[in-house]
Every structure is written in C-alpha cells, then in structure tokens.
C-alpha cells in the first residue's frame, strides 16, 4: 500500500514537472499559474502543494535538475584524457545531449531572469561546474601545444554557444542527420583551436 | 501647431516602444498587459491605441524594427568585397551591434514563439536576409580557396550563435573591453574557416 501511494506520488511529481516544463516553454514562467499547471495534470491546485511549496521552487527544480542531469551525463560520457580526443567527445556529447532536450534548454536560458538571487547563484555554480570541464580541456590542450587558445574562458563560451545554437535550427526532419551535424561542428571546433 | 502635435505623437510612440521592450524583456510578452505599458509611460490605455492596434503588432514592430536596424547597420558598415577582410568586418560588426542592444537581442530570440504565423514568416525573411550576407562571404571565401567551409549554412549558424553569445556573458565593467573580445573572437572565427 505504501508502495502504491509512493509510486502515485512520484508519478504525479513527474507529470507536474512535465506539465510545468511545457507550459513555461510555451507561455513563459510569469504568465503561467499554479492553477493552470494543476488543471493540465487533472488535480486540484491544493494537491500541487504536496509536491512543491511554490512556483519559484518548481522553476528552480526544473532548471537545477536539467543541470544535474547534464553533469551526470557528461560524467557518464567518459571524456578521454588526451586534449584533442577530449574536445571531440565533449563536442559530440554537448550537441547530442542538448538536441534531445529542446524545451529544457530553452527555459534554462530564458527563465534565468525569473530565479530568485539565491536560486540563480546555485544554478550558476552548476553551470560553471560544467563549463569548467571544457575550459580544463582547452587549457590542457594549450599547455601540451596541441591547441591555440588565447583565452580559455572566451573559447569555452564561444564553443558552448555555437554548439547549443544547433537547437535553434536543427530539425529531425531536415536535410541533415544529427550525426552529420556533429561531424561538421567537430571540424569547425577543431580548427577554431588549431595550434 | 501641427508640428508640435506630430513631435509629441512621435515621442509617445518612442516611449511606448521603449517601455514595451523593457517590460517584455523583464516579464515576458505573455505576462505584460497593454494596461501595464500605458501605466509605465503615464497615459490612459485607450491612448495607446492611437499608436498601435494591439499587443501582437507591438511585439512584431519591436522585433521587425530591430531586424530592419540590423540590416541598415550592416549595409552602412561597408563590408569589403575580399572574403577574409569581409569576414573580419562582419565579425566585429555583429559583436558590436548586438552588445549595444541586449534587450532587443534577448526578446528577439525569446519571443519568436509569441508571433503570429504571418508575423513570424515576415521576421524570418528579414533574418534570412541578414544570414545570407554571412553565407555569401563564406561561399566566396571557399570558392577563392581562402576558406575551408564544409557547409556554408551550418558555418553561418555556428558563427552567428557564437558571436551573439557574447551578450550572455560580456559586462562592460568586466576584465575585458569589447575591443579585446572582438579581437579574440575574430581569431577564433578566422581559424574556424582556415583553409
């Protein structure tokens, strides 16, 4: 019995996150009420508060879980130690991971302005943890003389922006497969830091 | 007398756009009412309708004027004909132009989803007009053998994403001047298409 109740609660929690994600992505955080989210998943608005104390916490959890999932996934991707193979693995990982989560990526950028200062600081720490992995690859590559990197921080931001930008134009029904996109982007990233 | 009335109307129109831009950037289009915009500039909501028929038209004009201004500015930048100097001039122009307009750039990306299909199509045409200028430079460079470009469309999207991405991290009070940022980004763009 406890188990069934637990499963149902977990299920409602998951549907709540999914509904909030879609409503925030479509209309924006500020325009969506807890009442609308409750209606979307077919529960009373009071029932939501068993799962989440308020809308700000809901937004923060969505963004923070997106970053936690990214950090776990990059860990699981087993990026090699050698700088150039590491950069290739990171490039391909970043494109694939983000292309599979367009709504999370969109609200992660768009709704930063709606986080409380405390929540924004927590999210920034997660983001910097991810960015630091790419910066470390570039610094190792520059130190080993296999990459030219004037400024590891700017190169990190440039590479992440160009890779995440794939989400703005890539369509699965388009002329190119994601594998072809990865290939061309890896060529551009490799040249961008060519020693 | 006509002249004074005309100037006042133009002034209200400009203040209306500025207020809408800031409110949309802060709260999102869907969360902002015409009443709030009117309150922000100190007029009755009925007075807004002398300037703009509805909120959708207001959003479209903001985004469309941003693109029109971009197209005029790139024209005025007198990009040279030679491919490599053209790419350098385009890179520097794009960073400078966008860094000076963070709110317009932000809502131009974020509020695309709130345009009507007709307005979206009009804006897309303007955007493609701009992107085509960069694609043409890359194609000329590849044809002349001074650039390596596997896919001019993807290289265009990659370069624009990385350059516009400067807006997400650059602060005028930071460790770098915009001139230094331009310099490092031009180095990365040049290598990205190195033949």
Label each residue range with its predicted role.
Chain A
Residues 65-71, 118-143, 153-157, 183:
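Amphipathic alpha-helical packing segments from all-alpha helical-bundle domains
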Residues 52, 109-115:
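Short helix-capping/turn signature of helix-turn-helix
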Residues 61, 75-103, 155-159:
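Hydrophobic alpha-helical connector segments
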Residues 19-23, 93, 97, 162:
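Short amphipathic alpha-helical elements of helix-turn-helix/winged-helix folds
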Residues 1-11, 150:
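N-terminal intrinsically disordered/low-complexity leader segments
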């Amino acid at each position: 019995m406890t188990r069934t109740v637990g499963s149902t609660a977990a299920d409602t929690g998951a549907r709540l996150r999914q509904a909030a994600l879609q409503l925030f992505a479509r209309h924006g955080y500020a325009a969506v009420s807890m009442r609308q989210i409750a209606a979307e998943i077919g529960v009373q608005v009071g029932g939501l508060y068993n799962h989440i104390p308020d809308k700000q916490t809901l937004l923060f959890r969505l963004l923070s879980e997106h970053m936690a999932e990214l950090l776990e996934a990059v860990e699981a991707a087993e990026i090699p130690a050698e700088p150039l193979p590491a950069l290739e693995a990171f490039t391909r990982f970043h494109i694939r991971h983000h292309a599979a989560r367009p709504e999370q990526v969109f609200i992660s950028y768009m709704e930063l302005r709606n986080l409380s200062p405390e929540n924004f600081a927590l999210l920034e720490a997660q983001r910097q943890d991810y960015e630091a992995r790419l910066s470390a690859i570039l610094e190792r590559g520059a130190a080993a003389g296999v990459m030219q990197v004037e400024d590891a921080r700017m190169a990190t931001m440039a590479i992440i922006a160009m890779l995440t930008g794939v989400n703005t134009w890539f369509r699965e029904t388009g002329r190119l497969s994601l594998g072809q996109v990865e290939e061309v982007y890896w060529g551009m990233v490799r040249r961008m830091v060519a020693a």
